[in-house]
Design a protein with these regions (language model features):
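Alpha-helical transmembrane spans of integral membrane proteins, capturing the lipid-embedded, hydrophobic core
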Residues: 12-21, 47-51, 79-87, 91, ...
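Membrane-water interface at transmembrane helix exits
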Residues: 23, 27-31, 58-63, 90-98, ...
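Membrane-embedded or membrane-proximal helical elements that form or frame transporter/channel pores
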Residues: 30-45, 129-146
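Membrane-helix interface/capping segments
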Residues: 56-75
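Transmembrane alpha-helical segments in integral membrane proteins
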Residues: 137-167
């Protein structure tokens, strides 16, 4: 990728990451239960922002480089890398929150234990807490981040196709 594209990607990826961190912090301060897994206002805003920010960043790129004729691959790379940088920053921030705020971790354990108890009633909360704490190690968070990139690939392909069709 050309240097001018990489600067654009890193710049917009950092902006996306900091906006996602700001939204996470806002919901964390308002009510930390929004950060728990599931479909809620936080997850909806997070996904909508992720998609629309990438779309509008790509539109800015196209307007800045109007004289060039770019292909789908270039659009896809730019869009995906913006999401990659933004979600990485956001994921690392969430990891810090869960590892340094014991109350948030306990809320997570209680929330997921209530679902786990339906599946396996003999599982104690201490066993479940140990299981969950293993999932919040740095390596497991990186692994979780990699799986987060799968939907980002799909979003990038759709956004790139839309930009290519609009152009």
């Amino acid at each position: 990728m050309k240097k001018e594209y990489s600067y654009f990607v890193i710049y917009h990826g950092f902006i996306l990451g900091f906006v996602l961190i700001a939204i996470t912090t806002f919901f964390y301060i308002q009510n930390s239960t929004y950060l728990l897994p599931g479909f809620n206002l936080f997850s909806t805003i997070y996904l909508v922002l992720l998609v629309f920010f990438s779309f509008f960043s790509l539109r800015i790129f196209v307007k800045q480089h109007i004289q060039h004729n770019y292909n789908f691959r270039t659009f896809f790379s730019i869009c995906f890398l913006i999401m990659l940088v933004g979600t990485f920053l956001s994921k690392m921030y969430l990891s810090l929150l869960y590892n340094f705020d014991n109350n948030l971790m306990l809320e997570y354990v209680d929330y997921t234990y209530s679902m786990q108890k339906k599946i396996n009633p003999t599982y104690s909360i201490q066993d479940w807490e140990n299981t969950v704490s293993v999932h919040f190690t740095f390596f497991k968070q990186i692994q979780s981040y990699v799986f987060t990139l799968i939907p980002c690939t799909l979003y990038s392909a759709i956004i790139s196709l839309l930009i290519k069709l609009i152009r």
